[in-house]
C-alpha cells in the first residue's frame, strides 16, 4: 500500500453513501458505540455493501470485561464469538483475540479484535 491508495472518510457511518467498495475496512472503537439492534444491523449491511469480495474487515470493540461506558456514552461489549455470530453470513472469520489496552490515564481497558474476509454479496 501507499498513501495514494488510502481513503480516510469522516462521516456518520450509519449514513454512509459511496459509489465504490473497499479492500480493507478498519474499525477501531466505533462499532461498540452502536447500541441498538436496528443500527447494528445497518452497520453490518454497510460492511457487506462497501467491502469488496475478498476484502478484509478489521474490527476492535470493548471486550465482555471492558468498561460499561466510554466518554460518558453507553457502549456494547463483544466477545470474539459474538462478533463471529454477527458477521457470519457474509464474512469468513480469520482470527480474533483479546488485548489489554493501557490508556493515557494509567488505566487498562479490555478490547476484542477480529479479522474477517468478505466471502459473498447477498
Locations of regions flagged by a protein language model:
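Class I (Rossmann-like) S-adenosyl-L-methionine-dependent methyltransferase catalytic domain
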Residues: 1-20, 37-122
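Conserved acidic residues
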Residues: 23
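A conserved beta-strand element that flanks and buttresses the S-adenosyl-L-methionine
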Residues: 26
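Short catalytic micro-motifs in class I SAM-dependent methyltransferases
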Residues: 29-33
Amino acid at each position: 500500500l501507499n498513501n495514494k491508495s488510502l481513503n480516510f472518510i469522516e462521516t456518520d457511518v450509519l449514513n454512509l453513501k459511496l459509489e465504490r467498495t473497499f479492500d480493507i475496512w478498519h474499525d477501531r472503537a466505533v462499532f461498540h458505540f452502536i447500541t441498538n439492534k436496528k443500527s447494528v444491523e445497518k452497520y453490518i449491511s454497510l460492511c457487506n455493501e462497501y467491502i469488496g469480495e475478498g476484502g478484509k474487515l478489521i474490527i476492535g470493540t470493548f471486550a465482555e470485561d471492558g468498561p460499561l461506558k466510554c466518554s460518558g456514552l453507553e457502549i456494547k461489549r463483544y466477545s470474539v464469538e459474538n462478533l463471529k455470530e454477527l458477521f457470519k453470513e457474509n464474512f469468513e472469520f480469520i482470527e480474533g483475540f483479546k488485548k489489554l489496552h493501557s490508556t493515557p490515564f494509567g488505566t487498562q481497558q479490555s478490547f476484542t479484535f477480529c479479522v474477517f474476509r468478505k466471502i459473498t454479496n447477498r
